[in-house]
Every structure is written in C-alpha cells, then in structure tokens.
C-alpha cells in the first residue's frame, strides 16, 4: 500500500533521526571502550610506582601535578632538570628515585650515587638513551649518529682515533691564543662605549674560533664583522630550540635543513682546502686534520681506503665533514660554562684576586707577556692549578644536565634492594649528584679550593662527572678545559665583568644563578638572556 505524500516527510525525518542515533551509538561504544582501556592502562602504570622511592604521587595523574606546582613558581623557560632537583630537595629524596610521567615518557629513574653511576656507565657500558642527540639533526648529520653508535668508534675514527690527546691540543695553544686577539679588541671597544653585550655569544664565538683552529689548523675569523663561520653556525643551530616543539618542527625543518646544508658545505670546503694546502704531505701546523691526513696518505684507514695521493675519497671527506659539524657544535656548549665562570668570579672578588695572582706569577701580568709565554711554553697552562679548579667548580655547579641511559640489564641493585628497570629511562642527574652535601660540603657555595691538589677533604671517586664516563663520554673534554683556561687567562688580566640584567627580568632560584638561571633555550643549557654583561678595563 502506498504511503500518502502527506506522511512521507515525517517518515523520512524519523528515519534520518534513527540513523543518526544509531551511528552515534556505534561511535560511542568504541570511544567508551578506548577511554576505559586508557584508564585501566594508566592505573596499571601508576600502581607500579606504589612502593618505589619517589615524590608525592597522584593515583591517576602520576607526577605531573607536583612538577606543575613547582613550575608555577619558576620562570617558564627554566632548564627542566633543575625543576626535578628542586623537587628532590623539597622532599629529601634518596640518591635513587623514580618519576612517573606516563604517557609522555617511559618511567624515569634518577640516580645521584657515584658508585651506581660508575656501574651503569663504566661497568655495564650502557649506551645513551636512543634519540638524545638526534634532536640536533640536521645541524649534525645523521652520519655522525651512526658513527658514535659503534661502541669502538673512538679507536677506528680518522680524527678521534689518531691524535685526540691533551698533549696534542697543548701544541695548538699558541695559535688559539693569537686567534683571540680580535675578541680582546672587541671587548676593549665595548668598554670604551660602555656597551652591554651577551657573554654567552662572545664565549661561543671564542670557542668556535679555537675549535676551528684545532680542527683545521687555520683561523676562522669568527670575530670579523660579517664572519661566514659565525653566520653559518648560528643559522644551522638557532632552530634547535623551536624544533624541540613537535608542533613547530614540521614548519621549521625545511629552512633548517637548508641552513644546515650551507653550514656543512662551508665545513666541507674548508676540509678540502686544508688537504690541498698540505703540500708536503705531512702535518706541519698542528691540527686534528693534519694528523688524520698523514695517516690517510699512508692508506692507514681500512674503513676509508685512499683514492689517490692527491685526492680525498668521498666517504672520507663526508666523515670529516660530519665530524667537523659535531665538534664545532658540541664544543660551543662550553660557552655556558665560561659565562658562568665570569659570573661566579664577579660574585667572589677574593677568589678572582687569587686567580689573577696565579695568572701573573705563571704567565705574566699583561697581554703581551701572556702571549709570549704561551708561544714559548704552552705547557704553562698545566701550572694554572687554581684556574683548573675554578673551571671544575663551575662545572660542578652548572653541569650540562643529566645523561640519559638505556641499561642492558633489567634490574638494578641499590642499598640491598633490587629495582625492576625494564623499559626505564635511566638519568644520571649531575645537578643532584654534584650538590650532595655528603660528597661536597656546603654544596651550593662556590669554593674552587676544594679541587686543589692536597685539599683537606678529597673529592670522592666518581662524584664529579660533568663530562661523563664510559660509552658516550665527552671526547672533547681535554680540549674544552684548555680552551676555557686560555680564555680566562687572556681576559681577566685586562678586564672586569659584571652582569647587567634588567630589574624586571625573570629570576630563578639563587642557587641556580638567580637572574642568570639556566634555561633550555640553546643547543644545551644556557644562562638566561645569554648573560648580559658590561666590561670595564682594569685599573693598572
């Protein structure tokens, strides 16, 4: 029987409503099941932390609430590991404690015990947690990450495996010191104009210049008004911060890759130029590349067979290019350390006086005498005991942050208890380890004398480890210490430095630098605002 036309519209409307309701009910069921599954999964994860040492723990939200409460009292860009260390202090947590940040991260175990840190890094030879350094791609090529993934890479590497020693770096000191004349002239000009400058930026340029000298054996002109090197370096590294945000990275990545390719091309060209300039086929001016070329010409690298006496193989050239990018970028992390050293010395004038006295007694009391001393006897740097101690104490107070490891074992023993650490991120927390009062008395105080030979209270074994040990240790630590000594020696003789933050600037906890609190807004941990400073010529 046909439905009257007058009834068609109501029936159609009813049918559509029933269809929509049915579809809605169909969609609600899987969504509800998904929500139930997520709640059960989260509850299961949270229960795993029930009997573990940890800060106060929310049954459903884990440790997000307590970290967020702490963050509300701090500057927004503060370095995240400092927040964890403040929580550790507030709740007097032990040297091993756990954080539950699921689902953003796997369970994290924070370690600040030197013996346990030694076992994980040196005895178990655990590797760095996957993806830690990949955040620097494309500034550092993927080739470099594949290289360092090899446990034995430091033995066969065509640069690190040849002449990467403190004795070899000391031979480069005279040229490094000469290359800093331009920096000293720049500081002199800023003093005349009473100009405020960014210390972290100056230190970065200085370390870039000295690292380039060590690697290529040539001056990079990093303090020239339009330096090709500093421009290419900053263009390749500035996007690192924005790219850490997964929502911004897709928009940043195309231009970042373009700038990275330009940076790598500049390095590649310099490597080729260095090889072509080595006319005598032997290392003349001491440099890492000169030593590597000497071995290469003798066909001494099985992984990189020589093409001819006059040419570099493509593989060898690319290895040296990726290594150069990694070294130049990695070395500049020392800029934050040297910046904090200037800040701490300004805050402790008595220590600064002792340091200048040491510089004068060992190398002389003016620029010319220091440069002459370093030219004739570069090993004099080894006699700067207090300078070395100042740098070690600065690294203790302002380390580069925790080292994340992936342990090969499924359990970890500490103080008679066994912990299940399967699928855990193991974080060796230098910020916590270096400020333990039982290891470093009065740990928040700047006291470089504790590192002098014959100190009344010796530093416990494995307690000071800013460069880390075992797999993933900093291969450039000897070069970094030499560079920072040279910079302190040349600058403190002529200049006084003082921080110049605006009154309205954000301020972090005083124990972490106050206005110069450590941020995560650089390649690595960086003083807030790059540590603005004013420089004055010293009164003679």
From Swiss-Prot:
Binding-site residues for heme, renumbered to this chain: 474
Glycan attachment points: 17
Keyword Membrane: yes
Record localization: Membrane
Coiled coil (UniProt feature): none
GO CC, alphabetical: membrane
Predominant cellular place of this UniProt entry's protein: membrane
Enzyme class: oxidoreductase
Known EC number: 1.-.-.-
Cofactor: heme
Disulphide bond pairs: none
UniProt topology in membrane: Multi-pass membrane protein
Gene3D superfamilies in the cross-refs: Cytochrome P450
Identification of the protein by name: Cytochrome P450 monooxygenase ptmG
Gene name, Swiss-Prot/TrEMBL: ptmL
